[in-house]
Amino acid sequence: MHFHERFDVIVIGGGHAGTEAALAAARMGSKTLLLTHNIDTLGQMSCNPAIGGIGKGHLVKEIDALGGAMAIATDYAGIQFRTLNSSKGPAVRATRAQADRALYRAKIQEILQNQPNLRLFQQAVDDLIVENGRVTGVVTQMGLAFEAPAVVLTAGTFLSGKIHIGMQNYSGGRAGDPPSIALADRLRELPIRIGRLKTGTPPRIDANTINFDLMTEQKGDTPLPVMSFIGDVSQHPKQISCFVTHTNEKTHDIIRGGLDRSPMYSGVIEGVGPRYCPSIEDKIHRFADKSSHQIFIEPEGLNTNEIYPNGISTSLPFDVQLNLVRSIKGMENAEIIRPGYAIEYDYFDPRDLKNSLETKSIDGLFFAGQINGTTGYEEAGAQGLLAGMNASLQVQGKEIWCPRRDEAYLGVLVDDLSTLGTKEPYRMFTSRAEYRLLLREDNADLRLTEKGREIGLVDDERWAKFSEKRESIELELQRLRSQWVHPNSPLIDVLNPELNTPISREASFEDLLRRPEMDYPKLMSLEGFGPGLDDPRAAEQVQIQVKYSGYIQRQQDEIDKAIRHETTGLPLDLDYQEVPGLSNEVIAKLNDHKPETIGQASRISGMTPAAISILLVHLKRRGLLRKKAS
């Protein structure tokens, strides 16, 4: 049975990847269908009730700069906002928000329901329709076929998902939701490498049974940060505190005593878990010398008594979970509302994807999110936006686009995955980006919004606000460069008391701002130097561009050198056995990874500069030396 309409793009799954994919394709004018097993769970925060953080916040800002929904929903749902690494340089500062689950889900659903060109339909997908190496549609659980030339698959943890609590396990996509078994079996027939990964979640605690007086209160920042570039503090709901407590030796003894019934340590779980978000069992085992571990007590919302104890993700049996929770200071009488669990699921080797996130083996089929081996809402949302955008571009007959590593954390994410692959759940850190001074949270819009507008992702309202901000920054920078103060100027009397070294020769306002003891608000407060910019985000941008101009230019010079052969394309059907001079080891690595560009090839572990030179010579001799479209 065929549905009565055809679509341009079909998105399977309504999590963070799926919602951003569907919204991106629809914003670009493609007739888009979002299929989900349950419309009520669209935008669900399945694990921790938070958005952002180190590296992750950068991705949220980039999603926002390209017109995505995650940051907007966070501003409407955030019940505590903090800037992490605020005492460090701007490259590693990151915004993190504690979110009310219900408010976040409601805002995402509101955005989806009001998006032109987007249709929602509640049905699980069991099969893909593939004809002559190209996807042409999908078939749902009830046998209904939907047709489209592009399909974006964002299955999350649902593919052959198996939930573990102690030695008990059962099939599930997450607690309370069925897994996707038929679709997982169908995908296993495709010529794409497959593996198993694992993630977990902590038990949820009843706030009424916690003694918060025995814990350390953690308040949000003042002034309140805002997540979206078009957001405003007035959108934030009521702000509340989180709390901090710690495990202790008694906790650790309880956990050690239960390891014989742990599915992780008894060999029941095959999948590899996230290195940077380990279970409490893993922490006790790997860091045996530590006498305590920090736990963040995070409210799940304004109108719920559920608490998320960030730091004790576990799949231990329920009785062990209850005992370990009650051994922690402030939770001696705690009651568990939902037990913690681990979940195993299928993922596919992202080296079998192009950097557009289209599979190399099936034309028109795109993967995004945890199916590619990543972990985290932010990583999923970023991939979803890219996959939905490129699916739409392909359908419209336009060139696909993926930012380079020097243009966005999204570019770093996709390049890492498609070039190196991953054997464990991948999460983003600022340390993964070699050009992180240029890839700051604060300039994500300046880096990406113009490109987003060109592609069709950015609407008129966002574009107008961005253009106004960009123009005000440029005009203010011009003013600071063009206005000067002399040693005999009347302005000296108000200026010198604020400087470590008095002015001895003429200096521009820009020179003054570059001094370590001076910042933009202080300079603008001095008589004769202001009034400056009213928009604090534009003012921050002016200060950063001035103070870090030397470092920024140096990094840009490095990029210009590195980019010379970065985008030189490598034909996917290139027979590396025919390239004279390559070692058998290098040939094996190239055949295994199938890089799309010289840049990707150069980042494969064990690839030598000599091998890259040999490849370039071969391409030149064969007349294949050309840049890959970006």
UniProtKB/Swiss-Prot annotation:
What InterPro entries does the annotation carry? FAD/NAD-bd_sf, GIDA_C_N, MnmG, MnmG-rel, MnmG-rel_CS, MnmG_C, MnmG_C_subdom, MnmG_C_subdom_sf
**Binding sites annotated in the UniProt record for NAD(+):** 273-287
- Name the principal localization, coarsely classed: cytoplasm
Q: Which Pfam families match?
A: GIDA, GIDA_C_1st, SAM_GIDA_C
Reported cofactor(s): FAD
Its keywords, alphabetically, are: Cytoplasm, FAD, Flavoprotein, NAD, tRNA processing
Q: Tell me the compartments it is located in.
A: Cytoplasm
What GO MF terms are annotated?
Answer: flavin adenine dinucleotide binding
Q: Which residues bind FAD?
A: 13-18, 125, 180, 370
**NCBIfam families according to UniProt:** mnmG_gidA
Which family is this sequence assigned to? Belongs to the MnmG family.
Its biological purpose is as follows: NAD-binding protein involved in the addition of a carboxymethylaminomethyl (cmnm) group at the wobble position (U34) of certain tRNAs, forming tRNA-cmnm(5)s(2)U34.
Instruction: Kindly give the HAMAP family that the UniProt entry links to this protein.
Output: MnmG_GidA
Which protein are we looking at? tRNA uridine 5-carboxymethylaminomethyl modification enzyme MnmG
Q: Which organism is it from?
A: Shewanella woodyi (strain ATCC 51908 / MS32)
| Species classification | Bacteria, Pseudomonadati, Pseudomonadota, Gammaproteobacteria, Alteromonadales
